[in-house]
Regions:
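Short glycine-rich substrate-engagement loop in P-loop NTPases that contacts/grips substrate
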Residues: 1-14
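Walker B catalytic acidic pair
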Residues: 18-20
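Conserved catalytic/switch belt of AAA+ P-loop NTPases
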Residues: 27-51, 55-59
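Amphipathic alpha-helical segments of the small helical/lid subdomains adjacent to P-loop NTPase cores
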Residues: 41, 46, 68-98
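Short regulatory helix/loop adjacent to the ATP-binding pocket of P-loop NTPases
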Residues: 51-67, 81-82
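Accessory nucleic acid-recognition modules appended to NTPase machines
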Residues: 101, 105-264
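Active-site ExK catalytic segment of metal-dependent nucleases
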Residues: 263-273
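Catalytic cores of nucleic-acid endonucleases
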Residues: 271-288
Length: 288
């Protein structure tokens, strides 16, 4: 769109604009159009998770825009009977809806390759696809664990700041969730580094080379896989105001501590047949 003002000004009703990250001059124009008194048009802007897109939207359209994250399928959309394939394949539609497990795995492998070789560059991230691929695979081994940038950087042979920039890129493109610890003065030494999760369970399984339900079931990453999958499902279901994890060096931990409408809600996410009483709930409950 070479002349967005000329094209968009006459339009009324709902106007859909796709690939907005490729139109650097769009957002100042939308600001002018959004401020018209009669407000004849509403704009639905679609685009990939580009840092530049987010920056322009927040700067040019502050107070005029609502950001909506388009996620994959969740349990409420596919039904309880499809929970297991959702866990195995993840929520990307083409992966989940594939007729065969092998087709799903092939799609995820192709997605990862395309993301590394084309999408990151198109979104403004200037990093080596090979280096990022190695980092992403290594990060999957830390799925559900406390971030240790120095250790990961040392294993990859890069500087800690470089490892952090890789993590930032994956978080900004919604591939990774960085869950911060709950920081209050509890009189005990709290863990202060974030936990890291690969957000889509199917992508996590692909990075780990887990091709089937049997592979996942026998993998030492079974518990971590379920924890990450359940975490994303809970987060989408509860619509919390703030999200943390709670952990102290004595070993007490909540996988998810959500704040919603002034209430604290704690979750312990385990792959077990029957839940058991967890001491950390009592510890957390006694805190202010």
């Amino acid at each position: 769109m070479e002349n967005p003002m000329t094209v968009l000004k006459p339009l009324t009703g709902l106007v859909v604009i796709d690939e907005a990250q490729r139109m650097p001059g769009l957002f100042p124009v939308l600001r002018v159009l959004a401020d018209r008194e009669d407000n004849p048009a509403t704009f639905l802007i679609l685009g990939s998770a580009s840092p530049e897109l987010s920056r322009q939207a927040s700067e040019s359209l502050a107070g005029r825009v609502e950001l909506i994250e388009m996620r994959g399928f969740d349990q409420s959309e596919v039904g309880e009977d499809s929970l297991d394939p959702l866990w195995m394949r993840g929520g990307f539609p083409r992966s989940f809806l594939s007729k065969q497990e092998e087709d799903s795995m092939v799609w995820r492998k192709n997605f990862i390759a395309t993301f590394l070789e084309r999408d990151l560059s198109n979104l403004g991230f200037g990093m080596s696809p090979v280096a990022m691929g190695r980092f992403w695979t290594m990060l999957s081994h830390y799925h559900g664990q406390i971030w240790n940038g120095n250790e990961i950087a040392s294993s990859l042979g890069v500087a800690p700041n470089t490892a952090k920039s890789y993590l930032d890129a994956l978080e900004q493109t919604y591939m990774v969730r960085r869950l911060q610890p709950w920081h209050v003065n509890l009189g005990k030494r709290l863990v202060k580094s974030p936990k890291i999760y690969i957000r889509d369970s199917g992508i996590f399984h692909t990075l780990q080379g887990l091709r089937s339900r049997a592979d996942v079931q026998t993998s030492p990453k079974l518990g971590a896989s379920w924890e990450g999958f359940a975490l994303e499902e809970v987060i989408r279901a509860i619509q919390a105001d703030e999200l943390y994890f709670y952990s102290i060096h004595s070993g007490s931990e909540l996988d998810l501590l959500a704040f919603r409408n002034g209430r604290r809600i704690g979750f312990e996410l385990k792959f077990e047949d029957a839940p058991s009483d967890v001491e950390v709930f009592r510890n957390c409950k006694r805190r202010p």
